[in-house]
C-alpha cells in the first residue's frame, strides 16, 4: 500500500509559491470510480460536517477542491496546524493533486501566529526546514491514505451523477451516493 511504502510528496516551487503537486495512476480503474472514491474519502475524512470544507465539485470535469486542515502528530517536535487548499482532478486514469496556499499556525507564547509557507527561510533557519519537513510528513500521510482508499475501496455502482452534482438525494441512491 501507499501507506506501508511511506511515500512522500515533497514541496516544490510554482512561481513564488510552495505547492505539493503530482499525479498517481490507478489503471485499470475507470475515471468515474477513481473520482468517486477520492471524493468519498475526502467527505468522510477531511470534512468535519457533511461536505463542509469542500469548496467546489465539478462532476463533468471530475474535479473537486477542499480546504485542508492538517495537524502535527502528537509525538512530533513541531506543534503546528497547517491550512491549505487541495485540488483534485481525475483524467485518463490518473488522480492529479495540487496543494497550495499553505499556511502554518504556530503557538507563540500565548498567541497563535499564522505564516504563509513562502515566508519561511529554510536555508537560513533550521527550525523553518523542520516545519517544512513536518508539513511534508503530514500531507504525505494524508495523501497515502487517500490513495490507498482509492485503490482498494469497492464502490457500489454510482448511477445518480446528476443528482450528486446538484446535491439532491433521491430515492434509490446508495449511502455513498448520498454523501
What is the predicted role of each segment?
Residues 1-157:
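Ser/Thr-rich, low-complexity intrinsically disordered terminal regions
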Amino acid at each position: 500500500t501507499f501507506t506501508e511504502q511511506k511515500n512522500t510528496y515533497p514541496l516544490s516551487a510554482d512561481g513564488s509559491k510552495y505547492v505539493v503537486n503530482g499525479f498517481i495512476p490507478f489503471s485499470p480503474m475507470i475515471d468515474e470510480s477513481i473520482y468517486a472514491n477520492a471524493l468519498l474519502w475526502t467527505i468522510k475524512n477531511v470534512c468535519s460536517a457533511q461536505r463542509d470544507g469542500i469548496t467546489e465539485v465539478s462532476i463533468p470535469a471530475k474535479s473537486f477542491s477542499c480546504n485542508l486542515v492538517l495537524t502535527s502528530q502528537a509525538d512530533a517536535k513541531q506543534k503546528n496546524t497547517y491550512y491549505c487548499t487541495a485540488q483534485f482532478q481525475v483524467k485518463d486514469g490518473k488522480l492529479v493533486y495540487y496543494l497550495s496556499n499553505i499556511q502554518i499556525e504556530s503557538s507563540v507564547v500565548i498567541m497563535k501566529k499564522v505564516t504563509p509557507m513562502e515566508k519561511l527561510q529554510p536555508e537560513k533557519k533550521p527550525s523553518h526546514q523542520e516545519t517544512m519537513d513536518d508539513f511534508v510528513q503530514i500531507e504525505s500521510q494524508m495523501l497515502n491514505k487517500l490513495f490507498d482508499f482509492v485503490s482498494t475501496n469497492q464502490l457500489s455502482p454510482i448511477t445518480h451523477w446528476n443528482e450528486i452534482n446538484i446535491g439532491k438525494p433521491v430515492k434509490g441512491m446508495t449511502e455513498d451516493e448520498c454523501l
